[in-house]
């Protein structure tokens, strides 16, 4: 295939896919200023942090990138214009922002502006407690005001870091408030990571009914946003959807999250002593499980594993789906998908839908074979291996 590196191929499942060849490209520093938007929200500020490193990273971005967006256009142009450098050194622009006097001297866009991705990542890695993570939405809001676009690799890192620290709801709120935060679901990896964590929190509760229903609502909310909210659409997403051949809201890998949680709820259908409301919920769970399973097998080609569903071109570029070919990453996402297929097949089979169960088993067998190849390539103790062993193998 043209443009594809033949060397260092990593084979996972039935395809040969290119291995990572270099570090992710850093987003270039922005060399132009944007006209400030009307302040419809409070001015971005940050809470007390747990470390001086985090405070420095946040304040650097606030002073150099965020606060200038609140200046009137003519003053903003002035502080970035070199011909006013000496004048501003003696007489800086002083303006009240959110009731506080702010002083602006000349800012050289090439040498004075911080590297946005580097500083955001530094801030993210320095966040330790709830107070630190509470600054995340304001940080992204400020970057959105300044038209700083997150590099392709950073959004999924934000989801992973915050959710690992227990802040799934913070991420979901940023997605809901996308107009303010600019935190979009435009990249395949970001969506995959978010759906993984929603399921993981339900799994950690042993799929208790309240937590599983809550998780199912959150997954459906994500799917609805992917289908109907144009703010989560972009050129990058359109390209990735063309490479996968699925719009995000119909991508089988994403729909498997809904199937997984619905299967866990439907498995409770035979519990005795249910109230009339619980019986109605159980009947709806069973009905939805059959509906979601039928939809999934229509979209998911027979005999195809996860990687085989998408085009070869999807795995060429780092900005697209190459992340999926890393064995331990593949195992993390495949674990809940495989659990969904197996559990759903078992339940619909018990309900008398034999042909549908057989189709689910067909997809499960393909995913399991692919996952076993990935499992053999990871070192003992790696995160992907542990997740796979716990979710699929039932290991505690």
From Swiss-Prot:
Compartmental location: Mitochondrion
Keyword Mitochondrion: yes
Keywords of the record: Mitochondrion
GO CC terms in record: mitochondrion
Major localization listed first in the record, in broad terms: mitochondrion
Description of how the protein assembles with itself and partners: Component of the mitochondrial small ribosomal subunit (mt-SSU). Mature N.crassa 74S mitochondrial ribosomes consist of a small (37S) and a large (54S) subunit. The 37S small subunit contains a 16S ribosomal RNA (16S mt-rRNA) and 32 different proteins. The 54S large subunit contains a 23S rRNA (23S mt-rRNA) and 42 different proteins.
Family statement: Belongs to the mitochondrion-specific ribosomal protein mS27 family.
The protein's role, per its UniProt record: Component of the mitochondrial ribosome (mitoribosome), a dedicated translation machinery responsible for the synthesis of mitochondrial genome-encoded proteins, including at least some of the essential transmembrane subunits of the mitochondrial respiratory chain. The mitoribosomes are attached to the mitochondrial inner membrane and translation products are cotranslationally integrated into the membrane.
Protein name in UniProt: Small ribosomal subunit protein mS27
Organism: Neurospora crassa (strain ATCC 24698 / 74-OR23-1A / CBS 708.71 / DSM 1257 / FGSC 987)
Organism lineage: Eukaryota, Fungi, Dikarya, Ascomycota, Pezizomycotina
Gene name per UniProt: mrp13
């Amino acid at each position: 295939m043209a443009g594809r590196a033949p060397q260092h191929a990593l084979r996972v499942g039935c395809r040969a896919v290119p291995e990572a060849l270099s570090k992710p490209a850093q987003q270039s520093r922005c060399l132009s200023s944007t006209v400030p938007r009307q302040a419809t929200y409070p001015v971005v500020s940050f809470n007390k942090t747990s470390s001086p490193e985090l405070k420095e990273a946040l304040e650097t971005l606030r002073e150099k990138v965020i606060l200038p967006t609140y200046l009137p256009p003519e003053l903003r142009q002035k502080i970035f214009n070199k011909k006013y450098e000496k004048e501003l050194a003696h007489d800086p622009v002083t303006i009240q922002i959110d009731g506080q006097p702010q002083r602006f001297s000349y800012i050289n866009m090439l040498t004075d502006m911080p590297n946005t991705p580097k500083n955001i990542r530094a801030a993210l890695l320095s966040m330790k407690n709830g107070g630190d993570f509470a600054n995340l939405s304001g940080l992204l809001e400020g970057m959105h005001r300044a038209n700083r676009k997150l590099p392709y690799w950073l959004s999924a890192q934000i989801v992973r870091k915050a959710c690992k620290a227990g802040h799934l709801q913070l991420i979901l709120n940023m997605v809901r408030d996308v107009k303010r935060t600019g935190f979009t679901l435009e990249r395949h990896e970001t969506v995959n990571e978010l759906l993984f964590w929603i399921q993981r929190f339900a799994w950690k509760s042993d799929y208790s009914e309240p937590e599983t229903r809550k998780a199912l609502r959150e997954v459906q909310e994500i799917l609805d946003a992917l289908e109907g909210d144009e703010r989560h659409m972009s050129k990058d997403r359109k390209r990735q959807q063309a490479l996968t051949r699925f719009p995000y809201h119909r991508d089988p890998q994403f729909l498997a999250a809904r199937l997984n949680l619905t299967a866990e709820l439907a498995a409770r259908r035979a519990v005795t002593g249910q109230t009339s409301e619980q019986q109605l919920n159980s009947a709806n769970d069973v009905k939805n499980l059959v509906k979601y399973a039928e939809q999934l097998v229509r979209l998911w080609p027979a005999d195809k594993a996860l990687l085989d569903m998408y085009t070869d071109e999807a795995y060429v570029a780092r900005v697209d789906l190459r992340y999926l070919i890393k064995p331990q990453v593949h195992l993390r996402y495949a674990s809940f998908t495989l659990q969904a297929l197996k559990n759903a097949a078992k339940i619909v089979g018990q309900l008398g839908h034999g042909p549908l169960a057989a189709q689910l088993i067909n997809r499960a067998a393909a995913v399991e074979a692919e996952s076993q190849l990935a499992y053999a390539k990871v070192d003992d103790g790696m995160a992907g291996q542990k997740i796979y062993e716990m979710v699929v193998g039932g290991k505690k």
